[in-house]
Amino acid sequence: MIPSSSPMESRHRLSFSNEKTSRRRFQRIEKGVKFNTLKLVLICIMLGALFTIYRFRYPPLQIPEIPTSFGLTTDPRYVATAEINWNHMSNLVEKHVFGRSEYQGIGLINLNDNEIDRFKEVTKSDCDHVALHLDYAAKNITWESLYPEWIDEVEEFEVPTCPSLPLIQIPGKPRIDLVIAKLPCDKSGKWSRDVARLHLQLAAARVAASSKGLHNVHVILVSDCFPIPNLFTGQELVARQGNIWLYKPNLHQLRQKLQLPVGSCELSVPLQAKDNFYSAGAKKEAYATILHSAQFYVCGAIAAAQSIRMSGSTRDLVILVDETISEYHKSGLVAAGWKIQMFQRIRNPNAVPNAYNEWNYSKFRLWQLTEYSKIIFIDADMLILRNIDFLFEFPEISATGNNATLFNSGLMVVEPSNSTFQLLMDNINEVVSYNGGDQGYLNEIFTWWHRIPKHMNFLKHFWEGDEPEIKKMKTSLFGADPPILYVLHYLGYNKPWLCFRDYDCNWNVDIFQEFASDEAHKTWWRVHDAMPENLHKFCLLRSKQKAQLEWDRRQAEKGNYKDGHWKIKIKDKRLKTCFEDFCFWESMLWHWGETNSTNNSSTTTTSSPPHKTALPSL
């Protein structure tokens, strides 16, 4: 007996039956459409061949974050509208490139076909010209993602990572001896913080750095805006004509730079840096600071020098001073170990006369210290608590983050160069500083910078939003002995040497209490006490400053400030040490409400030698 069919079997048979019916139907019409099908197949083959040729010449982009189609459209971020002066191009190439060595290949980035053909025509070179392919950066990669305001440096919650910019495709052959890249420059926007512009310059650098052997590699950047000054540096600039910039990069240094994170989204220096750093170029490296129009910073600079030597560093100490610093104070700086270099001040053209920032563009003079290959600049209100010589290993500009996408210029690695100095001067009337000072200006010039841990420029400051545990942590760091911090930066108007040593006088002024820390204050005075005794006299208090301190104390007493520092009796011996012609500071308080400024920046000294109780004023 044959078993009856199951429903499932019926469905299978129905499917098979329908398949046979369809096959017979197709066979009946097959002959009628055979010719038309053949034509369609031939057309498809031809279109496929054309598409393959097109893709071979212009490969598609593959960006995982947000795919960007290369196709028939161009990403507007990468469009470079600069007009190339071909006479300038021909002159530069013939004079500085082709006439000096044998070249095999020329890599071209972001140039269109017409520009490539024109380049071949004007240079009359037998080299292979290779249009190098670079995938566009994903559109969700912004400057803020490359330069975030904050990263988790200690990796408490996450390991910071940078967005990935596509790498350029570098051919094995021919050898690329000249790289040419055309850069966008939209001056209507933030051209100096342009992801595409950065991407193209890094791509050109990678092609140059991929070179093997000892032969020279040149890089030409076509840009109406100045290129990143610390990728291809001023020392490497061979020549410039109009918007054409020709560089001969140091390939070893370039490879080191390309190993760093693309932005400040990751640390360029490990949190636990090596304490013992050897450099073959130590004689060409120095710490540097600057004093202008501010003799009351002399004591701070002397203490900073002491702290550097206590950290174990033997690098040169260079201080730039202007004519407002007296001979007496300069003698103290020399005794502390500073090598003095005089300089002409540079006025900030946007500053109000006699304002605090009128002469702070004088910091640009650091780039004229060309007897050194690298310097670590420090503000004169810093202490170096642990050796930071290892920072000489890192490139310009290495610094801590400040806010938004910006770095703090209080401590930074600088590579002196006359051409970089000239760049700073050439743009002084065009580039606008976000804060009216040198830090804002430098941040507009050096937008590609490298983040170092905040422990290497730790600010003596309590933010309004700091939680109690954060304040406790900072307080512990300020007073740690042996130190945990590398560098402590004494922010605020009342510096430790302008207070009595008994406590931080910022406590007595309500608007300065965010800068008050007795622990940090004690740390500074430990360094002071370690100085040779003959240097202590440069930290004595003027009578006018004593009056200011007493005025502030009385105001705190009237306000019954809860911290209670105004109750502390002063034991600092400097209270009763007088070195001026007029020492009755108490009488100054009779009319102090009428003029309550210490005018520290405008102090003057007599040229006569000081006697034991008549030392010049700070």
From Swiss-Prot:
Mn(2+) binds at D379, D381, H489. Its cofactor is Mn(2+). Residues 598-608 have a biased composition (Low complexity). GO terms for biological process: cell wall organization; plant-type secondary cell wall biogenesis; xylan biosynthetic process. GO terms for molecular function: glucuronosyltransferase activity; metal ion binding. Residues 598-618 are annotated as: Disordered. It is found in: Golgi apparatus membrane. The record marks K363 as: Important for catalytic activity. Its EC number is 2.4.1.-. Keywords: Cell wall biogenesis/degradation, Glycosyltransferase, Golgi apparatus, Manganese, Membrane, Metal-binding, Signal-anchor, Transferase, Transmembrane, Transmembrane helix. Its main location: Golgi. Substrate binds at residues 379-381, 408-410, 435-439, 489-495. The chain crosses the membrane at residues 32-54. The keyword Hydrolase does not apply. It is an enzyme of class 2 (transferase). It is a single-pass type II membrane protein. Belongs to the glycosyltransferase 8 family. Glycogenin subfamily. May be involved in the substitutions of the xylan backbone in stem glucuronoxylan. This is Putative UDP-glucuronate:xylan alpha-glucuronosyltransferase 3. It comes from Arabidopsis thaliana.
